[in-house]
């Protein structure tokens, strides 16, 4: 029993002296300075180390481990290591770790969340007119490059706040997004107003507001109608009046209206309709058209490259055949010339040898004939010489 009590008494101070394993969350806006603090109660024979979310060492005690000057040492002592990261970006998000080395190794994790506040909203209005004479106003409120996605609502006549059809489009990195909210107004009064309100965590309770007054839209429509009427009277050619505020003629039937699914809110001055598919459908069509065009161009380019490669291969085969034929012809010509020279030399050698033999035989025959004549003449002279003395006697 006493042994257990003593063990517990020795264990509690060690736990208080060491760095507790826990996770802390820090939220910071993009462009601000991030401060990371690591504090322990131990003061002797201990070391502190900060690690990036990717696992690289930032500082080991007061010694920097990275050449990146983005991380700066704020304070170092035996029981504290604090660093700063100025001008924070979305790439600095993640879980940073502080390691405390003493008799054992303990870890403190700091989860850093970087917020990107939305830009000032842009509000656009357009009038759509159908063949049956009905018309409605489409309001689009958009903001760009925010993280996380903002919340967009519509304030009708300073009394009622509703939500429209919201579309979020994330950028290629998957972090920031562009948000658009669409609201369709079927009926409105001249003094009616609509405000686009944007809320976001990075705004810290503040709101971004883009107001719209329908009296400006009515004034623009009346001005455009008067100008068109004057032009029609002067040219004696009646025309239908159009609005300069993005007026669109819609030739579709009421079946399209049945396919639209919105939230409907009625007011004494306003009847609203939220269309979450209006902007998405148009962008989807344009995206499909662009993708089809790019695919067709890539296919044409692929065919051209294949034809060029085939032409190069054909030319290479023809050149190779011609080269082989020329080499074969040259070798045959060389072998033929060598054979002719060899045969001519053999013929010359064979014809000269009999001639030499004939000349030698002729020479021997002539010499033998000459000697024979000389012997005959000599024998005749001897016979004459012998016969003369006998006659004298």
UniProtKB/Swiss-Prot annotation:
Its main location: membrane. The chain crosses the membrane at residues 288-308. Changing residue 67 to A: Reduced binding to CADM1. Severely impairs interaction with CADM1. It is found in: Cell membrane. A motif (PDZ-binding) lies at residues 390-393. Residues 231-241 have a biased composition (Polar residues). In the immune system, expression is restricted to activated class-I MHC-restricted cells, including NKT and CD8 T-cells. Strongly expressed in spleen, thymus, small intestine, peripheral blood leukocyte, and in Purkinje neurons in cerebellum. Expressed at much lower levels in testis, ovary, colon, lung and lymphoid tissues. The keyword Glycoprotein applies. Residues 118-210 form the Ig-like C2-type domain. The keyword Signal applies. Monomer. May form homodimer (via Ig-like V-type domain). Interacts (via Ig-like V-type domain) with CADM1 (via Ig-like V-type domain); the interaction competes with CRTAM homodimerization and CADM1 homodimerization. Interacts (via PDZ-binding motif) with SCRIB (via PDZ domain 3); the interaction promotes CRTAM and SCRIB polarization in a subset of CD4+ T-cells. This is Cytotoxic and regulatory T-cell molecule. It comes from Homo sapiens. The gene is CRTAM.
